[in-house]
């Protein structure tokens, strides 16, 4: 036996039935779609329809709630401000505001839509006395800034 003499067993490989290719093909004319109606036309699928059984969307209970007035915060940490001060992107003499943080690329805040909250994760000491004007602060961040001689405007 050689490679060029190999072949499939009879019936092992079956050609698929080509539908809607003439009446003589056995699957012609309507091509298995029935007669007339929305589902016989091309490009139509009834979204969420499961053949008459109660759809999944109706079987599952309603759950949850999206509060419209939820405040979305851009979260920064004290060490982010320390890095910007070390790089020279921020000045310790100025009032640090949301706009200055955007300019210094500490916060990515398109059109100033989000609020900015300062946290103190990974920071246990803070040396520079800064004056900050942000939207929110964690309790630990407030303590660290005030201990360093800074102000929250």
From Swiss-Prot:
Q: Which UniProt keywords apply?
A: Ribonucleoprotein, Ribosomal protein, RNA-binding, rRNA-binding
InterPro entries per the record? Ribosomal_uL15 (IPR030878), Ribosomal_uL15/eL18 (IPR021131), Ribosomal_uL15/eL18_sf (IPR036227), Ribosomal_uL15_bac-type (IPR005749)
| Cellular component terms (Gene Ontology) | large ribosomal subunit
Is rRNA-binding given among the entry's keywords?
yes
Any GO BP annotation:
translation
Provide the residue span(s) of the region labelled Disordered: 21-41
Gly residues biased stretches: 23-35
What GO MF terms are annotated?
rRNA binding; structural constituent of ribosome
The UniProt entry's sequence similarity note says: Belongs to the universal ribosomal protein uL15 family.
Q: How does it assemble?
A: Part of the 50S ribosomal subunit.
| Stored HAMAP family | Ribosomal_uL15
Provide the function of this protein: Binds to the 23S rRNA.
Q: What is this protein's record name?
A: Large ribosomal subunit protein uL15
């Amino acid at each position: 036996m050689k490679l060029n003499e190999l072949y499939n067993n009879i019936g092992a490989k079956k050609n698929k039935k080509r539908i809607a290719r003439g009446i003589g093909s056995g699957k012609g004319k309507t091509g298995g779609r029935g007669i007339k109606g929305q589902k016989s036309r091309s490009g139509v699928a009834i979204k969420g329809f499961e053949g008459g059984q109660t759809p999944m969307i109706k079987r599952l209970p309603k759950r949850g709630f999206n509060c419209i007035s939820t405040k979305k915060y851009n979260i920064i940490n004290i060490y982010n401000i320390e890095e910007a001060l070390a790089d020279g992107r921020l000045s310790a003499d100025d009032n640090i505001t949301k706009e200055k943080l955007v300019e210094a690329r500490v916060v990515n805040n398109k059109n100033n839509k989000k609020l900015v909250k300062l946290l103190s994760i990974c920071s246990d000491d803070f040396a520079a006395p800064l004056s900050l004007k942000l939207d929110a602060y964690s309790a630990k961040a407030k303590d660290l800034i005030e201990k360093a001689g800074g102000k929250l405007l």
